[in-house]
Amino acid sequence: MNPPHEFAVSGSDTRYVGRVVALRLDHVVMPGGRTTEREVVEHPGSVVVLPLHDDASVVMIDQYRHPLGRRIRELPAGLLDAPGEDPVTTARRELVEEVGYLARDWSVLVDLVASPGFSDEAVRVFLACGLTEVGRPPGGDDEEADLHVVRLPLAEAVRQVLTGEIVNASAVAGLLAAHAVLAGPGLGPSLIGPSLIGPSLIGPAELRPVDAPWPDRPTRFADRRGGTPP
């Protein structure tokens, strides 16, 4: 059996560098020796927070997204664009800024890569429990000045995922993962009280600590901007 092919990069050209993304053109060696071009959108990465109340309700936001030209329902989130700031610190800050909550207990819920066919964007979704409402800070710029905070049962949010009302990829992943976690044996009561929402799927060992390894976290954009991730 032949060893797996190593897709070496023989050259790379930067085509655009913006505030949030960069575009580069890589020349990649394919099996058989042919070289082809691959467009890569570099992204700083982002964090998402699923704030879960003791009654199994979640806090979400309705926010305008210009590429879609409409408001969509999402979880609180933010870019990993602060030099030297670790992901959970960014997540804590975004939770306060976007929905006005502090959380006592944090864990990694799920990691995902958004569009690996053309982008290195990766997202880490945190589960935040033990919530205390402190209010959003005054101000807010651009789209954030218009966002609306909503609280709804997790079961209703999952229903909206399945009916196509919630389409944000990280929200879909986070909500379905939370549904699975709460259905796990012994885990639901320890997080949110006695009410479970489905059959057992996974156990408590599946939740990871906030500093769990994240091998797909992007670094190229941060390196380009002079802020290598911690």
Segments from the language model and where they lie:
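Conserved hydrophobic/aromatic beta-strand scaffold that supports enzyme active sites
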Residues: 23-27, 50, 60, 125-127, ...
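Acidic, metal-coordinating catalytic segment for phosphate/diphosphate chemistry
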Residues: 11-48, 54
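Active-site segment of metal-dependent pyrophosphate-handling enzymes
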Residues: 22, 44, 52-53, 65-67, ...
